[in-house]
């Protein structure tokens, strides 16, 4: 459960990210494919090379979904219901991949905003990404 302090940290961090969210989403997705090659199996139709326009575009979709989640932290299940259905029923993404991408998102944000990435902010973002992952995998059961 996200505390009021967690929500404040997440919103403040997302505000600082601003227009870079799509760029960071693409970078985190590319990092995920590099660090965890098994995640590539869900994207056989993508050019997965460094700097790929397809990876960047999908990373922007990830970032846009997270921006929606930040705006609706008090109702993540409602805000992410359609994405949960898509990933559970149509795409059948292995739930572990959300944890892997979350880790790569944390690394990417820490690289770009080291001064802002305090232990408290790290913990809040980790809890937030975990909450988003839980919602996205909730319809698997």
UniProtKB/Swiss-Prot annotation:
N6-acetyllysine: residues bearing it: 16
UniProt KW keywords: Acetylation, Heme, Iron, Metal-binding, Oxygen transport, Phosphoprotein, Transport
Annotated GO CC locations: blood microparticle; haptoglobin-hemoglobin complex; hemoglobin complex
Modified residues (N6-succinyllysine): 7, 11, 16, 40
Transmembrane regions listed in the UniProt entry: none
Residue positions where Phosphoserine is found in the record: 3, 49, 102, 124, 138
Disulfide bonds listed in the record: none
Recorded GO MF terms: haptoglobin binding; heme binding; iron ion binding; organic acid binding; oxygen binding; oxygen carrier activity; peroxidase activity
GO annotation terms (biological process): hydrogen peroxide catabolic process
Residue ranges annotated for the Globin domain, each copy included: 1-141
Phosphotyrosine carried by residues: 24
Binding positions for heme b per the UniProt entry: 87
Tissue and organ expression note: Red blood cells.
Modified residues (Phosphothreonine): 8, 108, 134, 137
Family stated for the protein in its record: Belongs to the globin family.
Subunit details: Heterotetramer of two alpha chains and two beta chains.
Entry function: Involved in oxygen transport from the lung to the various peripheral tissues.
Alphabetized PANTHER family for the sequence: HEMOGLOBIN FAMILY MEMBER, HEMOGLOBIN SUBUNIT ALPHA
Full protein name: Hemoglobin subunit alpha
The organism of origin for this protein: Phoca vitulina
